[in-house]
Amino acid sequence: ASASASNKTYNGNATASTSLTFSGLVGSETLGQSVTSAFNNKNVGTGKTVTISAITLSDGSNGGLASNYTISAGQTTTANITAKALTVSGITASNKTYDANTNATMVVTSASYSGLLSGDNVVVSATGTFDNKNIGTGKTVTISSSYSGSDVSNYSITNQSSTTANVTALSLIHI
């Protein structure tokens, strides 16, 4: 029998969906199958090894009886695990007093991660730049994000591109 595994999108586990193509069956007999298989790990990659750990044959059609055949587990094949979509939002910028620069202080404590699997570790860090240095309300802040964490490579991340914050006038002190 030859094995064929399906590609999958990252789902946090190594379980694979595998099927067998039988050769050597008598006449037009067919057999049913239940295959247990797994990727070598849960992480994203191409050409990843998939190993079959158990095969259960069942009766098929045209007289194909499972009891007339034997098969052993242990076959391998390859398949791909592609990155899961992850969308980051909820990053904010702090309001500030005019200081003649466009630097923004970013707040990531309320960031949300749509698509992140429970137990996975992905953390955002962000820097921000106001559209100009002048005072204003609801000013656009462009966000530049970077990511870390043990599972970051398993995700295709859509960044939050901007937010808004205020720049207030600097109070002058009279002496």
What do the predicted segments below correspond to?
Residues 1-173:
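Short loop/turn motifs that initiate or flank beta-strands
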